[in-house]
């Protein structure tokens, strides 16, 4: 370890360094600087009157490996009187401030001109290096730093970079890095940095979590059209001004919304961002507008629009959705529910408005604003009011993923009949919500043929509706079980051009 303090042969002393001229210590005399001398035979040892202050945790670790003698730190006056005195060593003048960013100065306390001390130091260093395995050191390379021929101390902090070997310089660098304040890499970016990052993003699917927190993101969205409006908000067709990807932007009014409910929406939407399924509408991200008390949710754009809009548009034109198309829609919804079931999620809001189709005819589930329940523990919360709720939910009983199967059955029954399955349109329009919910608990669902309109439904289709609308949830199959129903199995074998179907629905 002594080699860490040995100057290299090629090192030149800095001529600007102060030249130390200290009085020689002879004949057991005490100088004016209170240097105490303890005699033991012919040997003399110098001690500084100033007791070094304790090392800090950083400096003690650094210099614990650089002492020339293992017992220097524990020496006392009593023990020194009982052993030959070693050559004098430089004392450490240490700054006691624990937050100091520079190393303490190393200053020799005496300049000993006696050649015996130089020889003793060389012999001591050689012996220690033999013990440590450093046998490549030669006496010529270990000139005493205390020789009178070099009055400029090589251990002054100002000359450290010029006179100390590379190993010690590495220690200095490591120490200074560990002592410097840690710069956190997770510091929030400034608004200008976020602006630059957002400019580098061309499409909505490339925005990361920080991009969605950008304050002026709303100003960078271009609205291409309105897809739907309601009392609670609206859905628009949008794209980023510097992008090309079309997406749907849903705006929800949160003026009178419970803050806890808003937090629930945030958590669930963030969780739903990880969903990757061809039967689930992709969720891109969300941001808030406190001035307008609104939440903006960006989702995959589905150009075929909702099942609700499709079947009502066909009714206006005197048409209906065929059983083959309904089979493909029911299969896709069941596969989407099965995927959510694997993710421990209950949708809880299956209805015609939340079943969407794109231009290619793909069917996907959307709107997870009130979804996100663990399936293993049955949910006991009653969220929202919907005419598509399963009986167990209306009664406030525990419910599971089979409640989504009920909602699917009621949805398919409505689309097939061209109206909500109530006794009459007049009753459905004027009935109070509570009475309608009580009617759902007691009615017997039935898919009826319409011979006058040349509409005849297959028995397997009617059986599928009956299984979905079992009032006892214990008798109602799960989505995965319903995929194996004979009607679904039979519809899988049929070729249906869903893309052509969507084009015909919206053909002018």
UniProtKB/Swiss-Prot annotation:
EC numbers: 2.7.12.2
Bias-annotated ranges (Polar residues): 35-47, 67-79, 131-158
GO biological process, any: pexophagy
Keywords assigned: ATP-binding, Kinase, Nucleotide-binding, Phosphoprotein, Serine/threonine-protein kinase, Transferase
Signal peptide region: none
GO MF entry, a single one: protein kinase activity
Region feature Disordered, mapped onto this chain: 1-21, 35-95, 130-158
PROSITE patterns (UniProt xref): PROTEIN_KINASE_ATP (PS00107), PROTEIN_KINASE_DOM (PS50011), PROTEIN_KINASE_ST (PS00108)
One Pfam family it belongs to: Pkinase
Cited InterPro entries: Kinase-like_dom_sf (IPR011009), Prot_kinase_dom (IPR000719), Protein_kinase_ATP_BS (IPR017441), Ser/Thr_kinase_AS (IPR008271)
Other known facts: Present with 1040 molecules/cell in log phase SD medium.
Family of the protein in this entry: Belongs to the protein kinase superfamily. STE Ser/Thr protein kinase family. MAP kinase kinase subfamily.
Name of the protein in question: MAP kinase kinase MKK1/SSP32
Species annotation: Saccharomyces cerevisiae (strain ATCC 204508 / S288c)
The organism's taxonomic lineage, starting at the top: Eukaryota, Fungi, Dikarya, Ascomycota, Saccharomycotina
């Amino acid at each position: 370890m002594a080699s860490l303090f040995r100057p290299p042969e090629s090192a030149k002393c800095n001529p600007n360094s102060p030249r130390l001229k200290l009085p020689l210590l002879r004949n057991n005399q005490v100088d004016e600087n209170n240097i105490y001398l303890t005699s033991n035979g012919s040997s003399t040892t110098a001690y500084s009157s100033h007791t070094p202050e304790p090392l800090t945790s950083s400096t003690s670790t650094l210099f614990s490996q650089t002492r020339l003698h293992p017992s220097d730190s524990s020496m006392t006056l009593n023990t020194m009187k009982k052993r030959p005195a070693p050559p004098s060593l430089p004392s450490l003048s240490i700054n006691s401030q624990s937050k100091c960013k520079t190393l303490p100065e190393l200053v020799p306390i005496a300049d000993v001109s006696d050649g015996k001390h130089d020889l003793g130091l060389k012999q001591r260093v050689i012996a220690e290096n033999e013990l440590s395995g450093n046998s490549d050191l030669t006496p010529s390379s270990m000139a005493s730093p205390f020789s009178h021929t070099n009055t400029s101390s090589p251990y002054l902090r100002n000359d450290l970079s010029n006179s100390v070997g590379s190993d010690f310089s590495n220690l200095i660098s490591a120490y200074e890095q560990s002592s410097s304040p840690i710069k956190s890499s997770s510091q929030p970016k400034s608004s200008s940095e976020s602006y630059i990052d957002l400019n580098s993003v061309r499409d909505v699917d490339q925005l990361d979590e920080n991009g969605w927190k950008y304050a002026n993101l709303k100003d960078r969205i271009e609205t291409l059209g309105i897809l739907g409006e309601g009392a609670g908000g609206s859905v628009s067709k949008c794209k980023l001004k510097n992008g090309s990807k079309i997406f749907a932007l849903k705006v929800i009014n949160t003026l009178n919304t419970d803050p806890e409910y808003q937090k629930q929406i945030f958590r669930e939407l963030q969780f739903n961002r990880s969903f990757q399924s061809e039967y689930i509408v992709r969720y891109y991200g969300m941001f808030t507008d406190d001035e307008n008390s609104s939440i903006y949710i960006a989702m995959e754009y589905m150009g075929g629009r909702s099942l609700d809009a499709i079947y009502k548009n066909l009714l206006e034109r005197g048409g209906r959705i065929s059983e083959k198309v309904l089979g493909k829609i029911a299969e896709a919804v069941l596969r989407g529910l099965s995927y959510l079931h694997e993710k421990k999620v209950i949708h809880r809001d299956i209805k015609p408005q939340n079943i969407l189709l794109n231009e290619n005819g793909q069917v996907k589930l959307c709107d997870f604003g009130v979804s996100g329940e663990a399936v293993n523990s049955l949910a006991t919360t009653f969220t929202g009011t919907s005419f598509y709720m399963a009986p167990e939910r209306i009664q406030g009983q525990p419910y599971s993923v089979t409640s989504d199967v009920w909602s699917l059955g009621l949805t398919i029954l409505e689309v097939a009949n061209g109206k909500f399955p109530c006794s009459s349109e007049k009753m459905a329009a004027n009935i109070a919500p509570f009475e309608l919910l009580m009617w759902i608990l007691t009615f017997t669902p039935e898919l009826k043929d319409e011979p006058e309109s040349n509409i005849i439904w297959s028995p397997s289709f009617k059986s599928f509706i009956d299984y979905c609308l079992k009032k006892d949830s214990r008798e109602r199959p799960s989505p995965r079980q319903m995929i194996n129903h004979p009607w679904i199995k039979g519809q899988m074998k049929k070729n249906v051009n869903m893309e052509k179907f969507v084009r015909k629905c919206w053909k002018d």
